[in-house]
Amino acid sequence: MAAQVPTEALKELNVAEGSQKPGATAQSKTDAAGDEHGGDDSEDEADGHVDGAAPTGEATKKKKKRKPKKKKKHPTSQTDPPRVMISQLFPNKAYPKGEEVEYKDENNYRTTNEEKRHLDNLNSDFLADFREAAEIHRQVRQWTQKTVKPGQTLTEIAEGIENSVRALTGHDGLTEGDAMKAGMGFPCGLSLNHCAAHYTPNAGNKMVLQQEDVMKVDFGVHVNGRIVDSAFTMAFEPKYDNLLQAVKDATNAGIREAGIDARVGEIGGVIQEVMESFEVEIDGTTYPVKSIRNLTGHNILPYSIHGTKAVPIVKSNDQTKMEEGDVFAIETFGSTGNGYVRDDMETSHYAKRGDSQHVDLRLSSAKNLLNVINKNFGTLPFCRRYLDRLGSDKYLLGLNSLVNSGIVEAYPPLCDKKGSYTAQFEHTILIRPTVKEVVSRGDDY
């Protein structure tokens, strides 16, 4: 989920020379495996008869052997659409690791250092939660890439992804507090064409995916508040291939540079250099691919998708360092437009602010809605469809009151100029003591 650079911070960005173009402005977890009580039903087969008495026909008959109980079999593959809980496919919680990358230069010793390896081993629950969330993300997105086609409504696509995530976590989010144990880390974003981020359909939305569209699919999965944030772009016409390749390569460049003691401003410079080495020809016109300079990656905290650190996607003087134990979403956005986004269209994404102060709310609808948010989402982002799903109604006045009071943050869609095309790719990386782990890496990207 994209983080936006505050407007005043843009003035501090030292954008690499030559990158500006004319006109340009970033649980109850259900162990479905269960206890399997196999039936080792031992039986004493008695031929018993009374001494001195002639054995009768009945007494000489052996007892019937009882058939042993059949052991429950664990599912071995995912369904279509995905509905098998991931814990059933991995009953021992041995979830796949992400891509492990050794640190470079002065941090290379960490890979074999015994003390660092010990620290890594202490993080078993932390790693298991992230790897479970990542495997759910991989299975759901690979199903999405296979099944989503032009002609589907955005609502159908978003709900298909979200319902699959809930099924694989085993938490449908309909009972109080259930969505905070595991489920959606934030709403499924489906941003089309010039819209780069934070768009998901509200109730009644009739928008249909078209053959010529470029769609950013950005969704999060959390387990115990540990959020995996990963995104990809879908296009159905080969003319957009270079745009998608530019952004994918830029994201991978950022991942390569990330690590302990890496400075985020320098990472941004590498991302920009790779991104802006591409151009794309669309319908006979050639466009330079630009990094969207007021969007950034970000670190991730428990139950908080946007932490306190940002990873720019253009060169800057930001000297903030990545540190051991950090979790980062490395995401990049490329555009054929201005390389700058503004708020546009109807807002759908919201999140309760972690730093919000107590406010005396006068509207009863605002008080009631805040109670729903606290019990079902906490500081996890939500959208209006999620409130509808919980049975909330006539909440818009209360929601606006919470936003105006500074309790809830609104995240409107972020768009470049109309007629342009934008693309996004994103991975979550764990800055472990011994290696960095691209936990959301898959065969697809």
Swiss-Prot record:
Q: Protease: present as a keyword of the record? A: yes
Record: residues binding a divalent metal cation 1 = D218, D229, E426
Sequence segments annotated as region (Disordered): 1-99
* Bias kind Basic residues: ranges: 61-75
The record ties this protein, via PROSITE patterns, to: MAP_2
Q: Name one Pfam family in it.
A: Peptidase_M24
**An annotated GO cellular component:** cytoplasm
EC number, as in UniProt = 3.4.11.18
* Cofactor annotation: Co(2+); Zn(2+); Mn(2+); Fe(2+)
Q: Which Gene3D superfamilies match?
A: Creatinase/methionine aminopeptidase superfamily (3.90.230.10), Winged helix-like DNA-binding domain superfamily/Winged helix DNA-binding domain (1.10.10.10)
Alphabetically sorted, this entry's keywords are:
Aminopeptidase, Cytoplasm, Hydrolase, Metal-binding, Protease
Give the domain of life.
Eukaryota
Annotated residues for binding of a divalent metal cation 2 = D229, H298, E331, E426
* UniProt binding sites for substrate: H198, H306
Name the major location.
cytoplasm
From the Swiss-Prot or TrEMBL record, state where the protein is found: Cytoplasm
Q: Which SUPFAM superfamilies match?
A: Creatinase/aminopeptidase, Winged helix' DNA-binding domain
Q: Which family does it belong to?
A: Belongs to the peptidase M24A family. Methionine aminopeptidase eukaryotic type 2 subfamily.
What's the protein called, per UniProt? Methionine aminopeptidase 2-1
